[in-house]
Amino acid sequence: MGGCVGRERAETRGRGSRTQRKRGGRNEPLKKDKPKWKSDYPMTEGQLRSKRDEFWDTAPAFEGRKEIWDALKAAAVALECSDHELAQAIVDGANITLPHGSLTECYDELGNRYQLPVYCLAPPVNLISERSEEDLTDNPEPQTAQKKEFQLKVRLSTGKDLRLNASMSDTIGLLKKQLQAQEDIDISHQRWFFSGKLLTDKTRLQDTKIQKDFVIQVIVNQPAPNH
């Protein structure tokens, strides 16, 4: 397994190449259609999540600028959640050029090339839903169970990482209020994502299958200041 992962990482590590590109080249609008692909083996949601986390955690260590990687990650999440307008705004705001209208090949304003693997843009067609197993054994825990709190890792689209006191029974709506109180970010400007999925206010953490070491992404959508 390690050999396969190592080979895949090597194949996708042209990501922040020094390949230079002349400015003023072709720049296509971001396409709305999501890439369709099939994994070599049926992949669970957890495996896909781990694969994506590995890429995003290591990509900035290679060529390219961290702020561009952060923008590409936010754009990829928005695009997978069918928020094409937000994804395009993120790309435009970071001055990212798309020669083919896809995040699989991008350039920053300095001409550095960035390549995103397809698994960061869409789940495979043979993805195994972990939710189905839970539905078969749907035994709600009694409300009398002791509430166990932990430090939830949250990463803002601004690049800031922070922690919130949370329990698995907390709803996203409740956590949004906590983030608002802690960081002064209006609830209406918060969009919470996990494993490429938009989390609604009524969603509970236990429904997301999140574990303590995982990170929830929060896109902060605030109006740009007038110049």
UniProtKB/Swiss-Prot annotation:
PANTHER family, alphabetized: UBIQUITIN DOMAIN CONTAINING 1 PROTEIN-RELATED (PTHR13609)
InterPro entries: DC-UbP/UBTD2_N (IPR032752), DC-UbP/UBTD2_N_sf (IPR038169), Ubiquitin-like_dom (IPR000626), Ubiquitin-like_domsf (IPR029071), UBTD1/2 (IPR039869)
Pfam families given in the database record: UBD, ubiquitin
Gene3D superfamilies attached to this UniProt entry: Phosphatidylinositol 3-kinase Catalytic Subunit, Chain A, domain 1, Ub domain-containing protein, DC-UbP/UBTD2, N-terminal domain
Region (Disordered): 1-45
Species of provenance: Danio rerio
Protein name: Ubiquitin domain-containing protein 1
PROSITE patterns: UBIQUITIN_2
Start-end of Basic residues biased regions: 15-24
Start-end of Basic and acidic residues biased regions: 1-14, 25-39
Role according to the record: May be involved in the regulation of cellular senescence through a positive feedback loop with TP53.
Ubiquitin-like domain ranges (all copies): 150-225
